[in-house]
A protein has these predicted regions:
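Detector for C-terminal structural segments
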Residues: 18-147
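Short helix-initiation/N-cap motifs at beta->coil->alpha
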Residues: 4-19
Length: 147
């Protein structure tokens, strides 16, 4: 097995399709950063409609070209449901299909780091939020907060 490594600049790697390597899907294997604002990537990023193509002006997050009608259906129904509806459980089905097919392999998670003074209480990093001040209304400081 051979591997020819190409290190592109961000400008070149993320160039629009059809000629750009990532969005033009001109690669056998690609390592790139994808930003997430939740604990896992959104299922909608890997639906068939998100494959970059001429029809969508080469804009889409599914650069792997992953296609699975069962995944698409579960994801779309889950995204259109509320937490108290039965269809919301289809997020788990979409995740199970994703884990089985593995169209993308997460290499590492972005660490969330913060610091607070010793007499500061109520502060905790929420893994489901992008904001370290998400629970600001619960913050306090003073002698009653000392460890």
């Amino acid at each position: 097995i051979g591997l020819n490594t190409i290190y592109d600049t961000a400008v070149d790697l993320y160039a629009p399709g059809p000629t750009g390597p990532l969005f033009g899907r001109q690669f056998d294997l690609a390592e790139y950063a994808i930003g997430v604002n939740s604990l896992e990537p959104q299922c909608g990023w890997f639906t068939t409609s998100q494959i970059p193509a001429e029809a969508n002006s080469w804009v889409g997050t599914n650069v792997s070209g992953y296609k699975n009608p069962a995944f698409d259906s579960a994801c779309q129904q889950a995204l259109q449901s509320l937490p108290d509806e039965a269809e919301y459980a289809l997020h788990q089905e979409a995740q199970a299909i994703f884990a089985s097919d593995l169209p993308s392999i997460p290499l590492y998670l972005r660490l969330k780091v913060a610091a607070a003074r010793p007499d500061f209480c109520g502060f905790a990093l929420d893994p489901s939020s992008s904001y370290s001040l998400a629970g600001i209304e619960e913050f306090d400081y003073g002698d009653s907060c000392a460890p």
